[in-house]
């Protein structure tokens, strides 16, 4: 009986270690951050991310992650994305369309129980390696306050 318990314990531990190692993407994600937004996200509520020092001259792929509830009443979320990754002295501003619902009104993305996560590719950038690199996000919907966005974040991949 003890031998079976030892073998079972060893198999369980090996399974846990294997699951942890398999869930990691070594070298895939260079930076990942998320920020909760207020219940009513206004244009004054800028979401600001200070990026770690990225290696100069490397190309990175940006992805914006939006987590929303069914309380969000529009099909798309429009976001102003400002960054100074390519050149820390100059800010670049882009408007990013984040589709959250299909034309039929069904939520896009993954999620359960009314909370959905949508990944929106932003593009690729070459870093200047500055320690001052930042990314800022603010909604640009016509309403002064947006309800139903629980958090928004960025991922930077090699």
Model segments located where?
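An anionic, turn-rich surface loop/hairpin at beta-sheet edges
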Residues: 96-126
């Amino acid at each position: 009986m003890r031998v079976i318990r030892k073998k079972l314990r060893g198999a369980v531990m090996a399974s846990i270690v294997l699951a942890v190692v398999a869930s990691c993407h070594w070298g895939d994600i260079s930076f990942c951050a998320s920020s909760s937004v207020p219940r009513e996200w206004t244009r004054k509520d800028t979401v600001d991310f200070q990026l770690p020092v990225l290696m100069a001259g490397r190309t990175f792929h940006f992805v914006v992650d939006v987590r929303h509830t069914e309380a969000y009443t529009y099909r798309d979320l429009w976001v102003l994305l400002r960054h100074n990754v390519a050149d820390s002295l100059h800010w670049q501003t882009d408007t990013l369309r984040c589709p959250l619902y299909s034309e039929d009104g069904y939520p896009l993305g993954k999620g359960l129980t009314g909370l959905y996560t949508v990944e929106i590719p932003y593009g690729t950038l070459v870093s200047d390696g500055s320690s001052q690199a930042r990314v800022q996000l603010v909604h640009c919907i016509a309403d002064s306050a947006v309800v139903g966005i629980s958090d928004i974040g960025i991922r930077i991949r090699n």
